[in-house]
């Protein structure tokens, strides 16, 4: 199959979150299975691009769309070719892909509408780059209009509509939906018949993500549990009715991790290598991390790590609420991240009171992130919801049993230490509350202090799990095949939908 992977970000070129990591890892994993994959993304300012431009295609101004160019970049090695959408007036800006220091870019609807429209055009016989995709794989709201545009192209082609690509949309985080005033719809070339409740309309506005969910031939999300959760009012963010109506086309596929980059036996960012069979180097990593952060070298204290956004969604308020107890019980804390200023301040205040046993670094440092994963005894990740998550997989790969909530990808990738079959890899909260967090931390402390053999078994279980991308890639290829063989999909009628008060969000 020929697959176009359309995305707004891809590490290391540009990354604001997990989508950037997936865009870097999944396409080459699919290509390794024998499929032809191209990756489409905008040409942002100052991207650290390495490769050779081997093709150039002009896209003249047409209707709402400004003139642009498609540049093909071959990066060599295992990397898939890039198609960069160059339109300096839309993409050559500072800040993140979605916002400047002053806030969201006011023309984001046009910026990402163009990206989705070009993605859809590449799925037609009139592809502007001389290469036509069989599947257009959209990711989150910035490319989610592509399935709708493909529907318009297919309908316009009449009997020749079967030559138009099928589509998939992957939901990486349903909280971000690309919601814009409805007057953008006409400017983006969306036909009126697609603007009712059974189409892209969402509480009187245009929802790019809802359009993708309604018109895609296949819908995926980043873990099986999250696929179930987003069909509930609690985590559906106003789209649970749409997702329940389309449940037959919805599938959860657990993300993988880059097992070359996140591998303690060959990680150049940690002071000593180690493996499931030779764990000695982990003690050296713990000692080095303590030295770096100024923590006491106390052999009786268990070191808990945390790397992530400092928000209530990530359960940071529970970490703050349980920190004093954790320290009293013989723990230490090494925290790296940024987010809510109030939570940052609360963590810093705790660290100031306990400088020998708690350290907080506000910001991000890749080397320190690896050091925390390698040097900690356990990793805290008590998210209230987590579509997939990566750090819990990194932690298991590094022999650092995580403490997690039973949600999303955390539930799918961590087995509790009390597993009757002896396959435990971490500690799963028994509920979602401060008390449940404190109890799980207490279980981890108790096992680490009293049962070293059981703890080593927990470490080895996690380190021996395969979190690579191959299994995920196979599942996506199977889903592509199902989308190609599926009969024409039609949006659900209004009677099939049920909305709650939405939490629309246009940006990450």
Curated annotation (Swiss-Prot):
InterPro entries: GS/SS, Starch_synth_cat_dom. It comes from the Bacteria. Residues 483-508 are annotated as: Disordered. Its EC number is 2.4.1.21. Keywords: Glycogen biosynthesis, Glycosyltransferase, Transferase. It holds the Pfam family Glyco_trans_1_4. ADP-alpha-D-glucose binds at residue 15. The keyword Glycosyltransferase applies. It catalyses: [(1->4)-alpha-D-glucosyl](n) + ADP-alpha-D-glucose = [(1->4)-alpha-D-glucosyl](n+1) + ADP + H(+). One of its GO terms (molecular function) is alpha-1,4-glucan glucosyltransferase (ADP-glucose donor) activity. GO terms for biological process: glycogen biosynthetic process. The keyword Secreted does not apply. Pathway: Glycan biosynthesis; glycogen biosynthesis. SUPFAM superfamilies: UDP-Glycosyltransferase/glycogen phosphorylase (SSF53756). Synthesizes alpha-1,4-glucan chains using ADP-glucose. PANTHER family: GLYCOGEN SYNTHASE, GRANULE-BOUND STARCH SYNTHASE 1, CHLOROPLASTIC/AMYLOPLASTIC. Belongs to the glycosyltransferase 1 family. Bacterial/plant glycogen synthase subfamily. This is Glycogen synthase.
